[in-house]
Amino acid sequence: MALNVVILAAGKGTRMRSELPKVLHPIAHKSMVQHVIDTAHSVGSDAIQLVYGYGAEKLQSVLGEQQLNWVLQAEQLGTGHAVAQANDNIGDDDTVLILYGDVPLIQASTLEALLAAREDNGLAILTVNLANPMGYGRIVREANKVVGIVEQKDASAEQLAINEINTGIMAAPGKQLKAWLGQLSSDNAQGEYYLTDIVAMAHKDGVEITTAQPESAIEVEGANNRVQLAQLERAYQARAAEKLMLEGANLRDPARLDIRGDVTVGMDVMIDINVIIQGKVTIGNNVTIGAGAILIDCEIGDNAEIKPYSIVENAKLGVEASAGPFARLRPGAELKRDAHIGNFVEMKKAVLGEGSKAGHLAYIGDAQIGCGVNIGAGTITCNYDGANKHLTVIEDNVFVGSDTQLVAPVTIGKGATLGAGSTITSNVAEGELVITRVKQRHLTGWARPVKKPKS
């Protein structure tokens, strides 16, 4: 029996006031519908039907490379009509799980509980109890058994008092679902084909109807405008921050941390305020991350420190390495054990060896730097000739004086010393001292120019 997931994603989202389809608006740097797709995969979906309509080109440009069956809903005539568009892709023996592209916080554990609650060939619906159920379809029960769902606009006064509401998420048997969808009518206040009407049909057919509920109501909330989108973002971030704290991270203020990807943390990690963590990030034990730092797709070793306002992107910090404040590690940069870069140092496609240091104001690109090297302030690896990039190699225990330019390709041998202000254009042998400064001149009797008076 295959698990066939149908995701409804055809709506425009007029209240978003955006040309972007509603389901492509992001939560934690990932579209709402992508969150739903990922959750569908995590519960073991065998196939995913994406019902689309508005903004087809934008949807396909964002999601097109994934294993999805694209199902067009040319007219938006209700949720029942939307699901019916996928009928040709639903097998009689399938379990059909219906999800929504604008409900991004639904948890895999909740869906697993829903699927587990479904009896053989039965219908399972996800419900939630709300103190204020205004606007939602109500779950109608008789003798505690579900017999139907009535929408807000069609509900009687007695039914409006019900606080158990329909989330729209359900699991149904494929054969019966297709039959029920074929019987839907638009004879209602909205003039639409309600998916919820299949519940009464299931009851009439004697099908067992069971329910499950999410751990939190926020899981089943959608976003129809940007205020609701922001509320979902905050809920996502609160949940992500809680997960980090349970895994061993100390958060200076959980409300001032943005997590936009998959983060793994070790024990006794300290994260200060206004940090952004994006993509796949691995953080070791006893790591300190300063205020305002940005970490993107990077690996941080044990006992490392990222000082305030540093950016680490597609880069690695080894054990006890440190960066910042105001340092930038660009893609391909790596600090080996106990290496350090300080304020306003930028690295790209470069390795700084064990115990080596670049304290401040340097650019290190396309470079291999050995152990115990000192890079003085203002040092630049001149790696680009206008057409191609070239490599700078600095071997162990080299001292590079301040304001030195290394014109690649060039190799500096072990233990060499480069005098401050030098421009190095050829290889330097092991142990050599190289100075390329112009000889200093002393001009006595020289008078500084005097400014002309303003007219």
Swiss-Prot record:
Per the record, which residues fall in region Linker?
A: 227-247
Q: Where does UDP-N-acetyl-alpha-D-glucosamine bind?
A: 8-11, 22, 73, 78-79, 100-102, 137, 151, 166, 224, 330, 348, 363, 374
Q: Where is the active site?
A: H360
User: Which gene is this protein's source?
Assistant: glmU
Record keywords: Acyltransferase, Cell shape, Cell wall biogenesis/degradation, Cytoplasm, Magnesium, Metal-binding, Multifunctional enzyme, Nucleotidyltransferase, Peptidoglycan synthesis, Repeat, Transferase
Q: What name does UniProt use for this protein?
A: Bifunctional protein GlmU
Membrane-crossing residues? none
The record's listing under PANTHER family reads:
BIFUNCTIONAL PROTEIN GLMU, NUCLEOTIDYL TRANSFERASE
